[in-house]
Structure formats: C-alpha cells, structure tokens
C-alpha cells in the first residue's frame, strides 16, 4: 500500500464514535506529532453536524451534498474530493451514497 491509502505508526482509539443512532460511526486516529483524524462512515440521509475546530473532510467513497452554516448553497462532493468546515460552526450533510471519509482537525 502507498502512503496515500494508509496511515503508518499511529494509535487508534478502540471505542467508536457513534452519532445519530448509528448513522455516523468513526474511529479516532492519533499521530505521533499530536494531531488526530477520524475515519468514518455516514449512511444515506440528512444530518446536521457541529464543529469545535476547523475540519477538512476528505471523501474516500460515496457522495454527499453539503451546506455550510449561513449559506443557502448546496455543493456536491464525491470520492477524491474534499471540503473544509470552519470551527465553531455547523453544516448540513445530505448523504446520497454511503460516505467513507477522513476528517482532519486543523
């Protein structure tokens, strides 16, 4: 496997992060430099998330539409694309096809 498809020399938090009655499940990945990411799956449906820190969401598989707080515009994202969400904000996500994602906390 290449560096683009895996993370090496990391720690994984065993307990899953489960949100919205299991519609979103992720695991936290801890890096030696103190950074963290979550790897997760969101099932089809419409959800609203809040953020503490700014986030970069990288879509690994699936498709979704995103609307950032304060915007009327929906944008569509698919595998290989990413979007950023400001810290201390909210966003709507409409998952069209089961979403496999990596979330980086910036």
Curated annotation (Swiss-Prot):
Matching entries from InterPro entries are given as: Ppnp, RmlC-like_jellyroll, RmlC_Cupin_sf
> CDD domains attached here?
cupin_PpnP-like
For this UniProt entry, the molecular function terms from Gene Ontology, in alphabetical order, are: guanosine phosphorylase activity; purine-nucleoside phosphorylase activity; thymidine phosphorylase activity; uridine phosphorylase activity
GO cellular component entries? cytosol
Q: Which reaction does it catalyse?
A: a purine D-ribonucleoside + phosphate = a purine nucleobase + alpha-D-ribose 1-phosphate; adenosine + phosphate = alpha-D-ribose 1-phosphate + adenine; cytidine + phosphate = cytosine + alpha-D-ribose 1-phosphate; guanosine + phosphate = alpha-D-ribose 1-phosphate + guanine
Q: What is its EC number?
A: 2.4.2.1, 2.4.2.2
Q: Enumerate the UniProt keywords alphabetically.
A: Glycosyltransferase, Transferase
Highest taxon listed in the record's lineage: Bacteria
Q: Where are the transmembrane segments?
A: none
Q: Which PANTHER family match?
A: PYRIMIDINE/PURINE NUCLEOSIDE PHOSPHORYLASE (PTHR36540), PYRIMIDINE_PURINE NUCLEOSIDE PHOSPHORYLASE (PTHR36540:SF1)
Q: What does this protein do?
A: Catalyzes the phosphorolysis of diverse nucleosides, yielding D-ribose 1-phosphate and the respective free bases. Can use uridine, adenosine, guanosine, cytidine, thymidine, inosine and xanthosine as substrates. Also catalyzes the reverse reactions.
Question: In which family does this protein belong, per the annotation?
Answer: Belongs to the nucleoside phosphorylase PpnP family.
What's this protein's name?
Answer: Pyrimidine/purine nucleoside phosphorylase
Print the organism lineage: Bacteria, Pseudomonadati, Pseudomonadota, Betaproteobacteria, Burkholderiales
């Amino acid at each position: 496997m290449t560096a683009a498809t895996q993370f090496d020399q990391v720690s994984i938090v065993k307990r899953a992060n489960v949100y919205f009655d299991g519609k979103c499940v992720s695991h936290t990945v801890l890096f030696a430099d103190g950074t963290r990411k979550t790897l997760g799956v969101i099932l089809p449906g419409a959800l609203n998330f809040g953020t503490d820190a700014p986030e970069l969401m990288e879509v690994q598989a699936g498709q979704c539409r995103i609307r950032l707080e304060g915007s009327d515009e929906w944008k569509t994202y698919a595998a290989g694309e990413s979007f950023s969400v400001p810290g201390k904000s909210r966003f709507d996500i409409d998952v069209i096809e089961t979403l496999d994602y990596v979330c980086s906390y910036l």
